[in-house]
Amino acid sequence: MIKRIAAVALAGALALSVAGAMPAAANDDDVIERGSCSGSADWKLKLSPEDGRIEVEYEVDSNVNGQTWKVKLFKDGDRIFRGTRTTKAPSGSFEVRVVTSDTAGTNAIRGKAVNAATGEACRGNASF
Protein backbone atom coordinates (compact mmCIF):
# COMPACT_ATOMS: atom_id res chain seq x y z
CA MET A 1 0.00 0.00 0.00
CA ILE A 2 2.79 2.44 0.92
CA LYS A 3 4.65 1.56 -2.30
CA ARG A 4 1.49 2.29 -4.33
CA ILE A 5 1.04 5.70 -2.64
CA ALA A 6 4.70 6.54 -3.22
CA ALA A 7 4.42 5.55 -6.90
CA VAL A 8 1.29 7.69 -7.38
CA ALA A 9 2.97 10.65 -5.63
CA LEU A 10 6.08 10.28 -7.79
CA ALA A 11 4.01 10.12 -10.99
CA GLY A 12 2.11 13.25 -9.93
CA ALA A 13 5.32 15.12 -9.18
CA LEU A 14 6.78 14.14 -12.56
CA ALA A 15 3.62 15.28 -14.36
CA LEU A 16 3.75 18.65 -12.61
CA SER A 17 7.42 19.16 -13.43
CA VAL A 18 6.83 18.39 -17.12
CA ALA A 19 3.78 20.68 -17.27
CA GLY A 20 5.78 23.47 -15.65
CA ALA A 21 8.51 23.16 -18.27
CA MET A 22 6.16 23.50 -21.24
CA PRO A 23 6.15 26.85 -23.08
CA ALA A 24 3.16 29.13 -22.71
CA ALA A 25 0.51 28.68 -25.36
CA ALA A 26 -0.22 31.43 -27.84
CA ASN A 27 -3.17 33.68 -27.11
CA ASP A 28 -6.23 33.17 -29.33
CA ASP A 29 -5.84 36.77 -30.57
CA ASP A 30 -2.21 36.25 -31.64
CA VAL A 31 -1.25 36.06 -35.31
CA ILE A 32 1.77 33.83 -35.96
CA GLU A 33 3.41 33.33 -39.34
CA ARG A 34 6.47 31.17 -39.99
CA GLY A 35 8.68 30.47 -42.95
CA SER A 36 12.06 29.54 -44.33
CA CYS A 37 14.82 31.97 -45.23
CA SER A 38 16.88 31.81 -48.43
CA GLY A 39 19.40 29.49 -46.71
CA SER A 40 18.91 27.10 -43.80
CA ALA A 41 17.50 29.58 -41.25
CA ASP A 42 13.82 29.94 -40.33
CA TRP A 43 11.79 32.98 -39.26
CA LYS A 44 8.72 33.57 -37.09
CA LEU A 45 6.62 36.74 -36.96
CA LYS A 46 4.17 37.01 -34.06
CA LEU A 47 1.66 39.83 -33.62
CA SER A 48 -0.22 40.20 -30.33
CA PRO A 49 -2.63 42.74 -28.87
CA GLU A 50 -1.05 44.77 -26.06
CA ASP A 51 -3.09 47.48 -24.31
CA GLY A 52 -4.64 48.80 -27.53
CA ARG A 53 -1.35 48.50 -29.42
CA ILE A 54 0.37 45.70 -31.35
CA GLU A 55 3.33 43.77 -29.99
CA VAL A 56 5.56 42.62 -32.85
CA GLU A 57 8.02 39.79 -32.23
CA TYR A 58 10.31 38.80 -35.11
CA GLU A 59 12.59 35.81 -34.57
CA VAL A 60 15.24 34.29 -36.81
CA ASP A 61 16.68 30.87 -35.93
CA SER A 62 19.78 29.79 -37.83
CA ASN A 63 21.02 27.23 -35.27
CA VAL A 64 24.43 28.94 -35.42
CA ASN A 65 25.64 31.13 -32.55
CA GLY A 66 27.49 34.38 -33.22
CA GLN A 67 26.00 35.36 -36.59
CA THR A 68 25.28 39.06 -37.14
CA TRP A 69 22.02 39.95 -38.89
CA LYS A 70 20.76 43.32 -40.16
CA VAL A 71 17.09 43.57 -39.23
CA LYS A 72 14.24 45.84 -40.33
CA LEU A 73 10.56 45.85 -39.38
CA PHE A 74 7.87 47.74 -41.26
CA LYS A 75 4.23 48.56 -40.52
CA ASP A 76 2.12 49.51 -43.53
CA GLY A 77 5.34 50.33 -45.41
CA ASP A 78 6.80 52.60 -42.70
CA ARG A 79 9.95 51.43 -40.92
CA ILE A 80 9.37 50.81 -37.19
CA PHE A 81 12.73 49.17 -36.41
CA ARG A 82 16.23 49.01 -37.88
CA GLY A 83 19.21 47.46 -36.15
CA THR A 84 21.58 44.52 -35.90
CA ARG A 85 21.18 41.40 -33.84
CA THR A 86 23.53 38.50 -33.11
CA THR A 87 22.38 34.91 -32.77
CA LYS A 88 22.95 33.53 -29.30
CA ALA A 89 23.03 30.22 -27.44
CA PRO A 90 21.41 27.90 -26.81
CA SER A 91 19.45 27.87 -30.08
CA GLY A 92 21.43 30.15 -32.40
CA SER A 93 18.58 32.61 -32.72
CA PHE A 94 17.66 36.21 -32.02
CA GLU A 95 14.40 38.05 -31.44
CA VAL A 96 13.34 41.66 -31.94
CA ARG A 97 10.36 42.97 -29.96
CA VAL A 98 8.61 46.25 -30.84
CA VAL A 99 5.27 47.66 -29.68
CA THR A 100 3.55 49.83 -32.29
CA SER A 101 0.21 51.57 -32.70
CA ASP A 102 -2.88 49.63 -33.77
CA THR A 103 -4.37 51.85 -36.46
CA ALA A 104 -7.86 51.44 -37.91
CA GLY A 105 -8.22 48.62 -40.41
CA THR A 106 -5.66 45.97 -41.20
CA ASN A 107 -2.08 46.55 -40.07
CA ALA A 108 0.43 44.91 -42.45
CA ILE A 109 3.69 44.00 -40.68
CA ARG A 110 6.80 42.94 -42.57
CA GLY A 111 10.07 41.65 -41.16
CA LYS A 112 13.35 41.44 -43.03
CA ALA A 113 16.70 40.11 -41.83
CA VAL A 114 19.93 39.69 -43.79
CA ASN A 115 22.95 37.74 -42.54
CA ALA A 116 25.83 40.23 -42.73
CA ALA A 117 28.40 37.54 -43.62
CA THR A 118 26.51 35.21 -45.97
CA GLY A 119 23.75 37.39 -47.42
CA GLU A 120 21.08 34.87 -46.45
CA ALA A 121 17.76 36.72 -46.33
CA CYS A 122 14.62 36.17 -44.28
CA ARG A 123 11.35 37.90 -45.19
CA GLY A 124 8.11 37.49 -43.30
CA ASN A 125 4.69 39.11 -43.51
CA ALA A 126 1.67 39.08 -41.21
CA SER A 127 -1.49 41.16 -40.85
CA PHE A 128 -3.28 42.18 -37.67
Which residue stretches match the model-derived regions?
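Edge beta-strands of extracellular beta-sandwich domains
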Residues: 111, 117-128
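Transition segment at domain starts
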Residues: 23-51, 127
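Bacterial N-terminal signal peptides that target proteins for export
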Residues: 1-9
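Solvent-exposed serine/threonine-rich low-complexity stretches and specific carbohydrate-binding patches
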Residues: 32-33, 78-91, 126-127
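Short, surface-exposed beta-strand/strand-loop-strand elements in extracellular ectodomains
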Residues: 68-78
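C-terminal segment of classical bacterial N-terminal signal peptides
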Residues: 15-24
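Short edge beta-strand/loop segments characteristic of extracellular beta-sandwich folds
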Residues: 55-61, 99
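Exposed aromatic-hydrophobic patches
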Residues: 91-102, 124-125
